[in-house]
Amino acid sequence: MLGLIGKKVGMTQIFQKNGIVVPVTVIEFQPNYIIGKKTVDRDGYSALIAGSVDLKGSKVSKPIKGQYKSLKDIEPKKYVIELKGLDGYDAGDEIKVDVFKSVKYVDVTGTTKGKGFQGAMKRHNFSGGPSSHGSKFHRHLGGTGQATTPARTFKGTKMAGRMGGNQQTIQNLEVVLINEEKRAILVKGAVPGAKGSFVVVKKSKK
């Protein structure tokens, strides 16, 4: 599966030839290198291991250094992904942005913005209680328990709690523009995460 590790720069808009304004997300790519391979004989399946963004020296342990011994001039990477079904690359090769030239739609995986502890109305889109005078609750989630049987609250019941900070994938985002010089692509619509967060862009599955 064709893919790259990139950084979400932010959102903007562009005009199409017919004058329609399209909201787009700018995703910038630092060099992505093949840092290893998985084989059927050794691992049970074949895949390429790609990495991007140099890891800070103080965070590089001896086991990590050992993984990069055979790679010349490539520093240990902070973000690493597996790419299945991608051929024609060897360890040390760079995957460039132009691989998306023939791709029309992509799936983008990122980490959603963390919202902290939130109530049921914001977290689960509950309607809340009456807003009028006399009501004793306005933003409460309502009842959470059962009757005498089973006399307990079921696990997984939607309640207030920590919101955001989860991995999320948005599928079938259209590739609007590819800028090889700036190592960036523009995709139609929004992608998960805050500005500056790292995302994985892969050729759409569907």
Curated annotation (Swiss-Prot):
A GO-annotated cellular component: cytosolic large ribosomal subunit
Pfam families: Ribosomal_L3
Region (Disordered): 127-151
Biological process annotations from GO: translation
Molecular function terms from GO: rRNA binding; structural constituent of ribosome
Cross-referenced InterPro entries: Ribosomal_uL3, Ribosomal_uL3_bac/org-type, Ribosomal_uL3_CS, Transl_B-barrel_sf
UniProt keywords, alphabetically: Ribonucleoprotein, Ribosomal protein, RNA-binding, rRNA-binding
SUPFAM superfamilies in alphabetical order: Translation proteins
Known function: One of the primary rRNA binding proteins, it binds directly near the 3'-end of the 23S rRNA, where it nucleates assembly of the 50S subunit.
Subunit structure: Part of the 50S ribosomal subunit. Forms a cluster with proteins L14 and L19.
Family: Belongs to the universal ribosomal protein uL3 family.
Protein name, as recorded: Large ribosomal subunit protein uL3
Taxonomic lineage of the native organism: Bacteria, Pseudomonadati, Spirochaetota, Spirochaetia, Spirochaetales
